[in-house]
A protein has these predicted regions:
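Membrane-interfacial loop-to-transmembrane alpha-helix junctions, especially the N-terminal start
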Residues: 2-10, 67-79, 127-138
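Alpha-helical transmembrane segments of multi-pass membrane proteins
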Residues: 10-27
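Juxtamembrane "helix-exit" motif on the non-cytosolic side of transmembrane helices
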Residues: 21-25, 63, 88-96, 122-123, ...
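Membrane-interface interhelical loops and short amphipathic "cap" helices
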Residues: 26-39, 95-97
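Non-cytosolic membrane-interface motifs at loop->transmembrane helix junctions
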Residues: 34, 95-108, 155-164
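Interfacial helix-start motif at the membrane-water boundary
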Residues: 35-55
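Membrane-proximal helix-loop-helix units in multi-pass membrane proteins
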Residues: 79-130
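Terminal transmembrane helical module of multi-pass membrane proteins
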Residues: 122-184
Length: 184
């Protein structure tokens, strides 16, 4: 049952995200998820709800399975608050207050979710090789994404790569059997 609870939300969110991204050009600024959302508000809200749900479900399953800490709970509340801000405030530069609240929410969601996933893997770093690999992969993706964001600003690809990586890595650790070592 855990496998379905983990993978189904990730698959649904990933498919919806790919479909949603077809409204823009993924490698250009006008293909940013928030930019698409200016014209397609309802679709943007659905994307946000599916994304935060898939990530929260998988982060919760992983933390409960592999750690004893409950520190992820306030982090998920902060992350979800960021997503709510992202969805409630327009990405419209002419409406400065809304624009800045939207950007702050997006940053809070992205940073806190990325940190929460990274900390999960880091806490388990010494347990198994898969956690070592995923810790390094997560760090590289988050740092690389940050650098690309500074260089190219927001694009659909820059926004979705860390999210899709999270879907994949979290689903992998949540669905693996307890006795299997993937990189062993």
């Amino acid at each position: 049952m855990r496998k379905y609870i983990s993978t189904v939300p990730c698959i649904v969110a990933a498919i919806y995200t790919v479909w949603y991204m077809h409204f823009g050009t993924a490698y250009k600024n006008e293909g940013a998820l928030s930019t698409i959302g200016l014209e397609r508000r309802g679709y943007f809200v659905i994307w946000g709800v599916l994304t935060i749900a898939a990530l929260c479900i998988n982060i919760t399953l992983a933390y409960k399975r592999y750690t004893k800490t409950k520190a992820y709970i306030p982090l998920l509340v902060i992350s979800a608050t960021g997503m709510i801000m992202t969805l409630c405030f327009d990405f419209d530069f002419d409406e400065k207050v809304q624009y800045y609240l939207h950007c702050a929410g997006s940053l809070i969601f992205s940073a806190v979710t990325g940190i929460t996933v990274f900390v999960l893997f880091l806490l388990n770093f010494k347990k198994e090789k898969i956690f070592k690999a995923f810790t390094v992969i997560t760090a590289v993706i988050l740092l690389g994404d940050f650098v690309l964001l500074l260089i190219y600003q927001e694009t659909g690809l820059i926004e979705t790569v860390p999210i899709f990586a999270g879907y994949i890595m979290l689903a992998v650790i949540n669905t693996r059997s307890d006795k299997v070592e993937i990189f062993g």
